[in-house]
């Protein structure tokens, strides 16, 4: 008989999925955030003028969301 409790999905997820972010991750995140903020600000202004109301997310929240989505893609490659 084999022991199926050795490599349970819980242990596999802990071993591969959750690593502590390193300084390099935070540097890339900051660079992407600072580079994305002017673009998000301009698009926020254009959207405000076109629709004559404020968007749901502000420019900083939009840049934060983009940096949060893009940075992990760099480290997965």
Curated annotation (Swiss-Prot):
Q: Which gene encodes it?
A: pufQ
Q: Would you tell me the protein name for this molecule? A: Protein PufQ
- The answer to whether UniProt assigns keyword Transport to this entry is no
Which InterPro entries does the entry mention?
Answer: PufQ_cyt-su
Similarity-based family:
Belongs to the PufQ family.
Species of the source: Cereibacter sphaeroides (Rhodobacter sphaeroides)
GO BP terms, alphabetized:
bacteriochlorophyll biosynthetic process; photosynthesis
Keyword DNA-binding in the entry? The reply is no
What this chain does, per the record? Answer: Required for bacteriochlorophyll biosynthesis. Directly involved in the assembly of both the B875 and B800-850 pigment-protein complexes.
Q: Which Pfam families match?
A: PufQ
Per UniProt, which keywords does this protein have?
Bacteriochlorophyll biosynthesis, Chlorophyll biosynthesis, Photosynthesis
